[in-house]
Amino acid sequence: MKFIKLALICAISLLPVTSLHAEEAHVAQIRDYIDLDLRPWLNDEIIITAIKAQNEKVADMSEEDIIALDNKWREQISSDAKPFIDEVLDRPLSKFLAAKQSESAGLISELFVMDAKGMNVGQSSLTSDYWQGDEAKWQKTYLEGADAIFIDSAEVDGSTGALQSQASIAISDPATGEVIGAITIGINLDAL
């Protein structure tokens, strides 16, 4: 009986280590993908210009105004008329991001760029909300400073069954080094 208890304790004590190593592998794979495949275009002029233009436009916007825009976005998701959503999806940055997603051959499930307040500047496809400023993807990148990366836990997508994660990266103005926004990339781990 002592042997069984000891064996059970040993087995249970290994579980967190196994999970930790699995998480480390997931994070390491995504970091490699970011460095090799994403960084080369993260400072593309279309991204930097779009973020800076929106930052200037929304500089004096209150959180109340931002929440109103987010609510407007959420309401339009289920509506036939989507003027606000369509305007964002028709932006040159959104088309650029959609092309990057398409070029990834299924590895990238979504891309969206956020401004200095956490609002979407451009996106490859429809997101469930417009304001990310209250979420870790923006808070753990933009607020943390240049080169900040936040890799979320891996989850099974309920609609596709694919194992996915999101990686978010602070975006800096190459001319000044100032953090101006962030990008979130949905990554299909089964394709990585």
Residue ranges of predicted features:
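Extracytoplasmic/periplasmic sensory segments of membrane signal-transduction proteins
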Residues: 25-127
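Sec/Tat signal peptide C-region and signal peptidase I cleavage site
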Residues: 17-22
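Hydrophobic helical h-region of N-terminal Sec-dependent signal peptides
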Residues: 8-16
